[in-house]
Design a protein with these regions (language model features):
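Glycine-rich segments within core transmembrane alpha-helices of 12-TM secondary carriers
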Residues: 51, 133-158
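Transmembrane alpha-helix termini and helix-breaking/packing motifs in multi-pass membrane transporters
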Residues: 59-63, 90, 147-168
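Helix-loop boundary and gating motifs at the non-cytosolic
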Residues: 2-51
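Cytoplasmic membrane-interface "Motif A"-like loop-to-helix N-cap segments
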Residues: 63-80
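C-terminal ends and interior cores of transmembrane alpha-helices
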Residues: 75-96
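Central cavity-lining transmembrane alpha-helices of secondary-active solute carriers
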Residues: 44-65
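Symmetry-related core transmembrane helices of the 12-TM Major Facilitator Superfamily/SLC fold
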Residues: 77-83, 164-183
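Intracellular juxtamembrane helix-capping segments at the cytosolic ends
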Residues: 31, 113-127
Length: 190
């Protein structure tokens, strides 16, 4: 892999990791608090953590993904579902549609976890042994950056522009973060 491709590949993976983490951090911060205010049990709030169960469907993703294109399809389809659900939630009223919102967020987390499975697998396959630590750094930076933005910056924006103004922007960001992968022809299984 030449240096330019490697740099672009690293940036692509950074975008994928930050795109999955920003909305998840926002929802994981806001929704549990609101659920407690609505007297949901802790076990019901625990349903917002489908990521811990992703080992149940990760073999299916791996079994149906052999080529770089297969993994990209998993990433695109799951991220587009993720963005679509975030966008749909933006048009629901938090007080009257609360149960629908929680259900859609849980489904969106499953889509995000599926994207993570495919992204992790592609990162492992696309980078040589000596570059795997760089790819892991992109994962860490994207995850930490996404947590700071989703759990911090978005909370401030949420207070300023509200649920209906914020979530369409978040959905568009998730889609925009797919663009580097869409245009990246340099990712190849090593």
């Amino acid at each position: 892999m030449i240096q330019k491709d490697k740099t672009y590949n690293l940036a692509t993976f950074f975008c994928l990791y930050i795109a999955q983490t920003i909305p998840m951090s926002f929802f994981s911060t806001v929704i549990p608090v609101m659920m407690r205010q609505e007297n949901f049990s802790l076990s019901a709030i625990g349903l917002l953590q489908p990521w811990i169960l992703k080992f149940l469907w990760s073999p299916m993703v791996d079994r149906h993904a052999v080529t770089t294109g297969d993994y990209k399809r998993w990433i695109f389809s799951s991220e587009l579902i993720y963005a679509g659900l975030i966008f749909a939630v933006a048009f629901l009223d938090f007080h009257t549609d609360f149960y629908t919102i929680v259900a859609l967020i849980i489904i969106s987390f499953v889509a995000s976890a599926t994207q993570d499975i495919a992204t992790d697998a592609l990162a492992v396959l696309a980078f040589s042994r000596k570059d795997k630590s760089l790819a892991n750094s992109m994962q860490s930076m994207g995850s930490f950056g996404g947590s700071m933005i989703g759990g911090g910056v978005l909370l401030l924006l949420f207070k300023q522009i509200g649920w209906n103004g914020l979530l369409p922007c978040v959905a568009l960001f998730v889609i925009a973060a797919l663009l580097p992968l869409f245009f990246n022809k340099g990712i190849r299984i090593q």
